[in-house]
Amino acid sequence: MKKKIKKIFAERSSWTFDKNIAQKFDYHINKSIPLYSEFQWIACQLSDYFLKEDSIVYDIGCSTGTFLKVLAYRHKNKKKIKFYGLDIVKSMIDFAKKKSNYKNIQYINKDISNFKFKKSDLIISFYTIQFIHPKKRQNILNKIYKHLNWGGGFFFVEKVRSYDARTQDMLTNIYEEFKINNGFSLKEIINKKHSLKGVLEPFSTNANILLLKRSGFKDISSIGKFINFEFFLAIK
């Protein structure tokens, strides 16, 4: 019998992050999203091409702050570099602050729509924009582009829709098999799917690229894609 993983319960209602989720989040997300760690590894490697001695970095939807800690360690010899983690969920920020031992990382409980950015060399968004209402996404991407320095990078990782319903059904089934193989029960998968209706709204690859282009990005590449998750690199 498969070992049951630690659970984040999702009832058949709108998805929310409760106050206890932060402690389980990293374990859960690694079990839920294919190539989660691998995409973070790619992001670390790519960061070398954007970060300088006095760079500013933003992680939008930083959750528990784990990735920013990895990034801060990688660039520990850049003494003036500053990292900012933003998340709308207070319990995530509180947890991130408790486990952080880097003086150059600041965690902020703030909605990106109301946040005032400084000019930065790198902005990161792992699986965050997909939770923002579609009518607000273009303004968010415009804001990101505006506050990047020339030559700055935007690491944009999202769940994506397929171009046609048949392929979407295939990939959804494959993704559900992935979660079952990682210890989730069918009931958990169904409840999670229902709870995310109207909350998680993925765009297609083309729609995400159009968002980036309309905001001003010209150099846009798909760095990696697995099932229905994709890593975009956009450079100003």
Task: Indicate residue ranges for each PLM-predicted region.
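A conserved beta-strand element that flanks and buttresses the S-adenosyl-L-methionine
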Residues: 124
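N-terminal, positively charged/glycine-rich alpha-helical extensions of SAM-dependent methyltransferases
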Residues: 1-24
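Conserved beta-strand signature within the Rossmann-like core of class I S-adenosyl-L-methionine
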Residues: 151-159
